[in-house]
Amino acid sequence: MQIQNSIRATLESNHGLLDVDYVANLLENLLRTWKHGKPTIKVREAIQLAHAKSIKVISLWPQETCSFRNFDGNPEDDPNVPWLVRRENSSGPFTQPGSETSSLEQLLNGLGCIARILRENTNTVEARRAIDDHFCKIKKPAKLTMVGIQNIKKSMKRLLVNMSPIEGLEELFFQARSLGVPSHLVESVRPPVDIHSGNMHRTGISPRKRTLPEPFDESNTISHRRTRRNTKQ
């Protein structure tokens, strides 16, 4: 849960109104998919483009400032479902018709916070076009629904299929300190996970995804390969 808490702290310290459960789960899935190395341009471009796409649905959002607390309900179907809820004492901007900010934008901004940890100073038109193709189905949604969210998740997964990874979770969350994550949250990024933890249910992590893989030791792998090669000789 240390990784979840680190991401939560990062998002909440930078943006007041965020679906931290959704973003934390999404980012943890990204971390699971990445193996070892540096992120490709596609990851950075995907996050940046998703942020840009949110601008197009601003005028279709509710008038009140909202924090995403529950993606399972539709506010029009059941007004009692806490799907769009204002978080008290928040400093985030309010969403008004035609405004330049929205809760969706803030949510995707949270992805941008993590993206800044990974970002390199590279940018290509080809990469942006490739990402645009993946996000073509969610360019102009009538409203944010479960279908729209699933499309975002599916698009992200497609982008991660043949992706190069980051160079270890320790480095990722070490750098996360610059975004305001408390030091005690990033000292250990691979703690044992309590199977009976209530947080596990709340964040929606399935039992088979409770632990992250051990960090990759490139030196050991190289020496192992050399040993095998020498043995054959």
Swiss-Prot record:
One of its GO terms (biological process) is plasmid partitioning. It comes from Zygosaccharomyces rouxii. Keywords: Plasmid, Plasmid partition. It comes from the Eukaryota. Residues 223-233 have a biased composition (Basic residues). Plasmid partition require REP1, REP2, and a cis-acting DNA sequence (known as STB). This is Trans-acting factor C. Residues 195-233 are annotated as: Disordered.
